[in-house]
């Protein structure tokens, strides 16, 4: 295993504990990424690389779609938001062969 991708910071906290138990150094021996960037990402050592979602934008779009559906003007819509990767110290550097 070269990396662990966690869907929440709370799961990442468990992964950090497991890596520690196995004497694996995050950011050197193994990479760890989380899919939210709340509080824990900043408190770990090394800080966790994370995929951050535009939560406010997603919420606004959801409300707009619901209001359109309620007024019966809206059709089924798809909305795609672009996440941002916030690089921190938890990703190991790749070795060139």
Spans of features found by a protein language model:
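Flexible loop/turn connectors
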Residues: 1-96
């Amino acid at each position: 295993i070269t990396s662990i991708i966690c869907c929440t910071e709370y799961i990442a906290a468990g992964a950090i504990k497991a890596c520690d138990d196995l004497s694996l150094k995050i950011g050197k021996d193994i990479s760890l990424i989380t899919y939210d960037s709340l509080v824990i990402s900043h408190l770990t050592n090394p800080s966790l690389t994370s995929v951050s979602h535009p939560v406010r934008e997603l919420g606004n779009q959801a409300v707009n779609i619901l209001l359109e559906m309620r007024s019966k003007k809206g059709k089924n819509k798809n909305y795609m938001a672009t996440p941002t990767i916030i690089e921190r110290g938890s990703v190991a550097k790749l070795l060139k062969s």
